[in-house]
Amino acid sequence: MLAEQGADVLKIEPPGGELLRLHGPNHVMSLHANCNRGKRCLAVDLSDQDGTDLMLQLAATCDVFVENFRPGVTDRLGLGYEAVKAANPDIVYCSVYGFGSTGPYCDRAVLDPVIQAITGMVAGQASPALPFPDLIRTLIADKSTAYTVAQAITAALLARERGAGGQFIEVPMLDATLAWYWPDGFSDLTQEDPTIAPRRAPDNYQLIETLDGRVVYYVATDKQVQGMWRVLGRDDLLADPNFNQISAIGKDAARAIAVGEAIHAGIAAMKTADVIEQMAAEGIPCGPVLERVEVMSDPQVMHNDIVVEWNHPTAGPLRQPRPAARFSETPGEFRPQIGVTGEHTDEILGELGYDDAAIAMLRGAGTVS
């Protein structure tokens, strides 16, 4: 994200390459490619004192230093906040932890599914049709944390620009994900003495099978619920004040369930295209449930020119999305560049003042690759 907004991002990894990179064909895994586009790659052995010294020299020239080791690891490597701050007092230093730098879980290993589970997100996916909850099949904790990190870094840079100087930022995945999930996921726990809602989607907000597929809809206003009854030909419910107003439906759990059942039954007898066309005409938010391969040919996706295809020198054709934010004066740059391990090592060392002989010496010692 920061690279797409113009930052020169340097990815530091071990001389042999990080594990995620090594799983793909020709050392290009799709997930790695999607997460590391537009970065320059430097391979450094951080267990070597020369590697540590090199990193401190590099940090002295940078605006931002980001790490996601477990708590205490960077201090042992000689690259903790105080060490980096000594090299560059104005540095914005961001540590990304699983649970935080302190507390009962701080030393535990953690990955995305664990954070999903411990934030209540997994339990929130249960429904009458799926009594046993399930994981969200995307790295939602990782990505919400990444957005939080990017936002925090830009805020710290703005504060520095206004005279605050450099600073340390801690972003635990637990905190970032819970804050991201909270507005709707914990709406019934926000106020004191809440009434805990059942673990199911509201009956005005559902995914439903049609004759030939699935659609999702959201009826949120009186006008929309009345439009739904017109789409389904339910004049009886359209005329009933208990069923044609959202407030009346929401006051009675049994009534809300009856609304959901009526909508399900009506939509089940229709084709997907007809449902979408008629709901759209009534101003009801709705859409088809697309397979991922179908997304590529969706008319709006194609119109927005979201997906870009380009050729990687070893992996071949790749598809990736453009930067989502469209700036009128300072547009983001799509950088179809995914560096191989250590691809830019010599270039970066040269910028630090190392000559060819010094670089060769570091390579020979295994400090860089």
What are these regions (language model features)?
Residues 273, 281-335:
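A glycine-rich dinucleotide-binding beta-alpha-beta segment and adjacent secondary-structure elements
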